[in-house]
Amino acid sequence: MPLLVDGQRVRLPRSAVELVRAHPPLEERARLLRGQSVQQVGPQGLLYVQQRELAVTSPKDGSISILGSDDATTCHIVVLRHTGNGATCLTHCDGSDTKAEVPLIMSSIKSFSEHAECGRLEVHLVGGFSDDRQLSQKLTHQLLSEFDKQDDDIHLVTLCVTELNDREENENHFPIIYGIAVNIKTAEIYRASFQDRGPEEQLRAARALAGGPMISIYDAKTEQLRIGPCSWTPFPQVDFWLQQDDKQILESLSTSPLAEPPHFVEHIRSTLMFLKKFPSPENILFPGNKALLYKKNKDGLWEKISSPGS
């Protein structure tokens, strides 16, 4: 069945602006979200989701109470939630393979909601802006189209993307919202930023920059964050890129150079350094080709635990 808004079938294709004009409650929800102040989210109880990652859990989780992601410029952050059992998935999509990613998001939630007798699937899309290359617009269209193709009814509750998430300053465009968090217990979605993006922030960023596909990073049954094992081919011309100045890196390695947060270039440089240091990560970063496992300790912070079978 299709994508629905307030019980009505969504007519596609149409732009985000056309969609909210046809459904005023969507426009109001986007306005309220844009109007919020940004909350700084601390590490306790947080599961931070990087680009090309997804995480899913439920209110029964004793370790995780918040899912979040930020630094989205042309990217979109997607939250899919089952209202019956509260199972919630958050993912950071960059448009690399939306056709494969949406079914992955759906199956991650449905693995929780098989036994839910009531409730419905609700989706929230946030991110992007009116960028010159129209990458945000393309991703908005892809996500709406792919959710509309799924077998289940999916209710579009929040749409704050592309033109609806755009501000203009000195004739340049920027996103209004760069990051959001969702409270697993209350289902509240709010504007957020994060200082702690771990664990293994550089490794996870390197995997995405090297072209890795969307992956699920959390096992809610064991309440463990699981990374890898993953591999990548040596990053092409890594020494060349590390020799470039900040302006060149920003203009060449960003989808939206003017709209990036201040730490973007520093983040790219450190990720490139990591890729140079570990051109083939398999046995060095993943001893015995086993995953790296982390669990929240009693203070709500990530702690490394031994790999399975070690």
From Swiss-Prot:
One of the GO biological process terms: ubiquitin-dependent protein catabolic process
Source organism superkingdom: Eukaryota
GO cellular component: cytoplasm; nucleus
Alphabetical list of InterPro entries matching this protein: NTAN1
Gene Ontology molecular function, alphabetical: protein-N-terminal asparagine amidohydrolase activity
Location in the cell: Cytoplasm
UniProt keyword ATP-binding present: no
Pfam family, one: N_Asn_amidohyd
Catalytic activity, reaction form: N-terminal L-asparaginyl-[protein] + H2O + H(+) = N-terminal L-aspartyl-[protein] + NH4(+)
Primary site of residence: cytoplasm
EC number, UniProt record: 3.5.1.121
Keywords associated with the record: Cytoplasm, Hydrolase
The keyword Signal appears for this protein: no
Subunit structure: Monomer.
Function: N-terminal asparagine deamidase that mediates deamidation of N-terminal asparagine residues to aspartate. Required for the ubiquitin-dependent turnover of intracellular proteins that initiate with Met-Asn. These proteins are acetylated on the retained initiator methionine and can subsequently be modified by the removal of N-acetyl methionine by acylaminoacid hydrolase (AAH). Conversion of the resulting N-terminal asparagine to aspartate by NTAN1/PNAD renders the protein susceptible to arginylation, polyubiquitination and degradation as specified by the N-end rule.
Protein known as: Protein N-terminal asparagine amidohydrolase
Taxonomic source organism: Mus musculus (Mouse)
